[in-house]
Amino acid sequence: MDIRAAEISQILKNEIANFGNEASVTEVGQVLSVGDGIARVYGLDNVEAGEMVEFENGVRGMALNLEVDNVGVVIFGSDRDIKEGQTVKRTGAIVDVPVGRGLLGRVVDALGNPIDGKGPIPYETRSRVDVKAPGIIPRKSVHEPMATGLKAIDALIPIGRGQRELIIGDRQTGKTAVALDAILNQKSANQGTDESAKLYCVYVAVGQKRSTVAQFVKVLEENGALEYSIIVAATASDPAPMQFLAPFSGCAMGEYFRDNAMHALIVYDDLSKQAVAYRQMSLLLRRPPGREAYPGDVFYLHSRLLERAAKLRDANGAGSLTALPVIETQANDVSAYIPTNVISITDGQIFLETDLFYQGIRPAVNVGLSVSRVGSAAQTKAMKKVAGKIKGELAQYREMAAFAQFGSDLDATTQRLLARGSRLTELLKQPQFAPLKMEEQVVVIYAGVNGYLDALPVARVRAFEDGLLALVRTSHGDLLETIRSSKDLSDASTQALKAIVETYAKNFA
């Protein structure tokens, strides 16, 4: 066997030429202890706060506590297969999620992984979950209405695009139902061609039963609303870090639309459960507890989340992100820690009360305690004209009703006021999944505030409303179209509307 020296030297030269000198360096640490969804890791000296780390079995976690000799990591998954002594490696990336139009119509977990069995998500880009909210200069004051389709809200507590309006109440008072109706009401706008009228919806379910989330998705699907919605679900069986992260992930998905000159609505259902999950994580990380055992930065947790809802100025694309956070109270106690925090952060609140709910007033909005700090800036001119009166009349009615309990001999004016108030209260009731368009609400409220219901028994108000709407939809579509396109109630429209309502009221028996 002969050895060719030239050939060997050529092979060696080729090998040397193709030799790659890039060695991949990954910083790894070791698990010191693990339990209750928290791992203590030694050796990750350069890890960043909020950075994703990966355990041996592929489960991911987030570095939250950076201490002198170890790192406190919260685990996004089960900690059963993580053992003491296992290696943990840095990923070099702060926690991020996929964002873009590809997520519409899908159900994802807090990390943006699909959980609806419809295959992988074709996302456009990834975005960090916890980013800084827009400053003062890029913002613009809220001035466009965000119609919910609920008379009680659109007339009395108007919500604008870019606003944060809290929905607060005890369990089983219809908080989710209000948010669901607001999502369903965007269907006609999203099916139209006007891009500026479209409103994409993100629903974040935190700590809810899986059956509840499945039911919610089913209702959206049946009503054709899933195609413009994203569902982010961190259910009751998910680890606390996932429940803590879900609202931030949903917010990042909503911000994609806001920053690309589109409009989005995000519902956090609910932030009390997120605060409880954050409290659990903080106590397990040995952070000092404060009031009600919540950590000291629980206010900052919610404020940095809700400040990201904004209306941007024209130079920044004029997009918007509207937030409807939900808070569940215990026995109507709105002076507890989390409710007071979120009330002070948001631009108004919708109070839902158990008593009203059981009296059959649904949506069970307490009009006296509810407020929108944006006010009529978020209403169309047409709605302003008819709804201005209803606020005053209902306020007087509530005042008089309190006194009327004590005396039976009331003068005619007071009796008239009480009769009008009870009929207006009846008029503001609305069945679920039946949102009304703005122009239809204007017609109904016009009839109420101008005394056309006063002669009717209260039990007949609903029938009157249904009949009037059916008449206007079938025979007077042009009037509805005029109000819709002009967003105003001109003198001519008012005269036409008056004639229609008068004729209908005479014939209604």
Swiss-Prot record:
InterPro entries documented for this protein: ATP_synth_asu-like_sf (IPR023366), ATP_synth_asu_C (IPR000793), ATP_synth_asu_C_sf (IPR038376), ATP_synth_F1_a_nt-bd_dom (IPR033732), ATP_synth_F1_asu (IPR005294), ATPase_a/bsu_AS (IPR020003), ATPase_F1/V1/A1_a/bsu_N (IPR004100), ATPase_F1/V1/A1_a/bsu_N_sf (IPR036121)
Keywords, in A-Z order: ATP synthesis, ATP-binding, Cell inner membrane, Cell membrane, CF(1), Hydrogen ion transport, Ion transport, Membrane, Nucleotide-binding, Translocase, Transport
Pfam families: ATP-synt_ab, ATP-synt_ab_C, ATP-synt_ab_N
EC number: 7.1.2.2
Catalytic activity: ATP + H2O + 4 H(+)(in) = ADP + phosphate + 5 H(+)(out)
Binding site for ATP: G169, D170, R171, Q172, T173, G174, K175, T176
GO molecular function: ADP binding; ATP binding; proton-transporting ATP synthase activity, rotational mechanism
Presence of the UniProt keyword ATP-binding in the record: yes
GO cellular component terms listed in the entry, alphabetical order: plasma membrane; proton-transporting ATP synthase complex
Membrane topology: Peripheral membrane protein
Location in or out of the cell: Cell inner membrane
Site (Required for activity): S370
Main subcellular location of this protein, as a coarse class: membrane
Function: Produces ATP from ADP in the presence of a proton gradient across the membrane. The alpha chain is a regulatory subunit.
Family per similarity comment: Belongs to the ATPase alpha/beta chains family.
Complex and partners: F-type ATPases have 2 components, CF(1) - the catalytic core - and CF(0) - the membrane proton channel. CF(1) has five subunits: alpha(3), beta(3), gamma(1), delta(1), epsilon(1). CF(0) has three main subunits: a(1), b(2) and c(9-12). The alpha and beta chains form an alternating ring which encloses part of the gamma chain. CF(1) is attached to CF(0) by a central stalk formed by the gamma and epsilon chains, while a peripheral stalk is formed by the delta and b chains.
Protein name as catalogued: ATP synthase subunit alpha
Annotated source species: Methylocella silvestris (strain DSM 15510 / CIP 108128 / LMG 27833 / NCIMB 13906 / BL2)
Gene that encodes it: atpA
